[in-house]
């Protein structure tokens, strides 16, 4: 069973760029992902190369030469008669491998595994790029929200400074109270400038991963993606064991290492091939005008000693297989840990979002009450108002951050089980 999830945060803009469009853009245009797609074509060609080992090789060749003898003498030094010839030869060679120690079969199987491996690596890269795109998309939204919150805070403190100046003239507050307000305003302006820089950085990161964006305000916080999440940690782990590309890659690399042993062992085995040559020669010599010849030859060879190279290659392949087995075992253990971490982060971020939402509501009520009491002269000091504004500001920023983290935690959980791909998200 899976939890069906529909993301809804706030109402979006009428002319907005939804998350699905941004992810589709990254999916189609990201250069790293496109480079990995080319690797699929490379693997397809590798399969064709491996198949060619089972097919005969055919070679056509021809030659023609021209003789021009100016002088010819016999053993006594006297001139002797000669006849120049212009030999021409045409031939065809056909060779078929009959046995090569099962290296050809193992090589073909390895190349087919390599094709599946390339597809798994493409899926892994796709997951990484899509998650980076989600981080960039939500990061830019968060930066814009933080900028707006800080802008509102600057506007609020500017009004408070104006109010405190009037209250100082009426003798309702002291100069130190006004100085506190002015200091708070200066701090808010500094945070606003910092938020502006963070927005620029977030925009550059967005364009690096996803692509150009004309209006950062066009991003929609209301996600149009809907998908299912695992309902339990155990289910998430079981799904990941079957679909996580990291595990698939480790398994396939181990399978390839097994084929490498067979290929290395074939260097110690006999090999056999059959060859056929048919040739036709004209004007061969002064006594032979034409010659047609056919040769059928069977060859068997068995390497006896090659300086120990063959045995060393075999031992190397065995060691590499042991290494891949250890890496596979480690990948299985790491997978459970990574899924458990993603699941825990998802649960914690959901609880934290609920807590921060309540915190913001409480901070808004408290700030409104303290502000009214301050303006009514009911005993609230300037410091009380400043502290209340600061608490509310931090709570709003924490809420925006918690909303983003909750969203990211769900996609991270999808990535950990192997479901963060265009097919599952229905991007295409």
Per-range role (PLM):
Residues 35-50, 125-148, 159, 166, ...:
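Amphipathic alpha-helical coiled-coil segments
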